Amino acid sequence: MKFFLSIFIFSTLTLVGCDSSNVKVKSSNSELSKYQKNAENGDPIAQYNMGVVYQQGLNGEKVDLDKAVYWFEKAAEQGEEEAKANLGIIYYTEGTKYTNITKALDTFSELSKKDNRVALNFLGRMYKDGVGVKQDNNKAFNLFNRAAHLGDLSAQFNLGNMYFNGEGTPLDYEKAAYWYNKAIINGKDGDAAKILAGMYYEGRGVEKNINKSIELLQIAADQGDQEAAQNIEIIKRECGC
C-alpha cells in the first residue's frame, strides 16, 4: 500500500495574535469599540489588540497593515513585547512594503534574550532557512527547543521536524513523536497530526497502531486536508476497518 504521507519542514506562519499570545482578542462589536476607545486613551494592551484586529482582519474589518503597524508601534513604545513580536513577523513576511529582514532579525534577536517564545521560534526559522543569517541547523534546533519548552505551538512542531529529519540533533523518532503530539494536544496542529499518523501507520518511533493513525488523520481531515481524508479511505479499504 502506498501511504501518501507529506513531511512538512515548517508549519504555516502563525501570527502571534493567534495561538502564541497571552492576550485573547475578542471580536464582537462591543469589544472592538472598547479596544478602540482604550487604545486611543493610551492603553498598550488595547493598542496591541487593535493591531491584531487589523493584522488578521477580525470582526469584519479588512486586513490593514498600515493600521496594524500603527497600533503595534504605539504598544511597543510602551514596552508591550507581543506587539514588538508582531512587528517582527510583519517585517519577516515577504511581499509587503514593511518587509525588512534586517529589522525582523533585530527584533527577534532582542526579544529572544527575554525568552519571548514567538521571537525564539521565528529566529529559529531564520537560522533554519538562512534568511538574514548564515544557515545553521544547530542554532535553529536550540532556538526551537527553547521556544517549544516555553509552549510555542509552531516551535513544538518545528522541533519535532528537527528530530524527525536529524537536523541540528541526532535523528530521534521517539522525540519527534513526542513533540508532534505536544503540538496536537496544545493546538490541534493538522500538519503534526498527519506526520504522526504516518509514524503510527509505519510503527516509526511509536508502536504501530492503525486505529491511532486514522484518528490522527481525521484531525487533519477535519481542517480541510484532502490528502489526509484520502489516506483515511485508503487505510480503511486496506484493513477493512
How does the language model describe each region?
Residues 25-33, 61-71, 97-107, 134-143, ...:
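Structural signature of tandem alpha-helical TPR/SEL1-like repeats
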Residues 15-17:
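C-terminal motif of bacterial Sec signal peptides marking the signal peptidase cleavage site
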Residues 49-56, 86-93, 97, 120-129, ...:
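Hydrophobic face of amphipathic alpha-helices that form TPR/SEL1-like repeat modules
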